[in-house]
Amino acid sequence: MLRNIIRFKGFGKGTSGGFLKPVSFRVQLTRCYRYDNGPSYRRFNNGEYSQKSSFKSILLDKSSRKYLALLFGGCSLFYYTHLDKAPVSDRSRFIWVSRPLELTIGNYTYKSIWRQTQQEILPPQHPLSIKIENIFMKIVEAAYKDPSVDNSLLDGIKWEIHVVNDPTASPNAFVLPGGKVFIFSSILPICANDDGIATVLAHEFAHQLARHTAENLSKAPIYSLLGLVLYTVTGAHAINNILLDGFLRMPASRQMETEADYIGLMIMSRACFQPQESIKVWERMANFEKQMNRGGVVNMEFLSTHPASTRRIENMSKWLPKANEIYEQSDCSSMGNYYKSFFSM
């Protein structure tokens, strides 16, 4: 999503499925299922015995180390046999969560968010809902044309657009596993135009196309295991959380956000939306953040789940030549006039 003030957490930026998510939404998808704050331990017999000391004794026992070696070998084999390539970016990532489970979680999350927003959602026949649906479906159609995309991930999905008409909410947009799309009217001034809306929607769509929800779920047991190992060294799970967040969870989240920026830019270009508008969107986002943070603390990127807007602008500028190439190869010059005339009706 986005930044803290805004899921693009999809585009929001948190400090965990975007812009910033409304404070009341605690579920973060693209970016990020987090079920606990780390492993916890219970001491017995007035501290004479602990899981920490027990785990250390296992490490020191020769026969136990053999079993640990076998366990490590099995886990390594499982890891390497579940490596997958992300579409468009071609990044290798570890995913073991099944597609049905991913869709089930998306459906559960949708019901929860629907209950919170249903009073503000515009009807499907509203002009703004129709406009955003048309933009989004052009992005989906463009994804089908990308040779690196597994079309089976898109087949059979019933895409539903929900425009949340709440100007006071934090600017936000996100796409859930299973095809449920939410975009808040408060983000539209930052989008400014159709190409800006496409920038936001393509980013959020990219999170689901790349299965970032499943990737986050797949990493959760690894983080728990590492937390257990760290506990044998630090003896304090608060320190474990700081280490895991600073060196693993947050960098991984920023990596997925950056990947969604890249995939989204390439797909929106293939859909004949102006790729250079993505830079302007993030410039407006950066200005919005400055206004919201006036007199506040400095937002440090390494403490955030999302890249800084300035870094996203740098990335977009670096990727723009390739995006322009895709735009030209998609015969967008002739399609552009038709598209503009269609939406001016």
Swiss-Prot record:
Active site (record annotation): 204
Superkingdom, natural source: Eukaryota
EC number of the protein: 3.4.24.-
Traits of the deletion mutant: Reduced ability to form viable colonies on glucose medium after acute treatment with hydrogen peroxide or chronic exposure to carbonyl cyanide m-chlorophenylhydrazone (CCCP). Cells are resistant to rapamycin and display reduced TOR signaling. Oxidative-stress response is impaired.
First-level EC class: hydrolase
Post-translational modification note: Forms a redox-dependent disulfide bond, which plays a structural role and regulates its conformational stability and activity.
Cofactor(s) needed for function: Zn(2+)
Bound cofactor: record note: Binds 1 zinc ion per subunit.
Residues annotated as transmembrane: 68-88
GO CC terms of this entry: mitochondrial inner membrane; mitochondrion
Chief place where the protein resides: mitochondrion
Keyword terms, alphabetized: Disulfide bond, Hydrolase, Membrane, Metal-binding, Metalloprotease, Mitochondrion, Mitochondrion inner membrane, Protease, Thioester bond, Transmembrane, Transmembrane helix, Zinc
UniProt GO BP: mitochondrial protein catabolic process; mitochondrial protein processing; mitochondrial protein quality control; mitochondrial respiratory chain complex assembly; protein quality control for misfolded or incompletely synthesized proteins; TOR signaling
Keyword Protease carried by entry: yes
Record flagged with keyword Protease: yes
Stored InterPro entries: Mito/Outer_Membr_Metalloprot, Peptidase_M48
Mitochondrial matrix topological intervals: 1-67
Location of the protein in the cell: Mitochondrion inner membrane
Region of interest called Required for protease activation, as start-end residue ranges on this chain: 314-345
Modes of activity regulation: Protease activity is induced in response to various mitochondrial stress, such as changes in membrane potential, oxidative stress or chronic hyperpolarization, and depends on its C-terminal region.
Family: Belongs to the peptidase M48 family.
Quaternary structure and partners: Homooligomer.
Function recorded in the entry: Protease that is part of the quality control system in the inner membrane of mitochondria. Activated in response to various mitochondrial stress, leading to the proteolytic cleavage of target proteins, such as OXA1 and COX1. Cleaves and thereby promotes the turnover of mistranslated or misfolded membrane proteins. Cleaves the misfolded multi-pass membrane protein OXA1. Involved in quality control of cytochrome oxidase assembly: mediates the cleavage of COX1 in cells lacking COA2. Required for the stability of the respiratory supercomplexes. Required for TOR signaling.
Protein name according to UniProt: Mitochondrial metalloendopeptidase OMA1
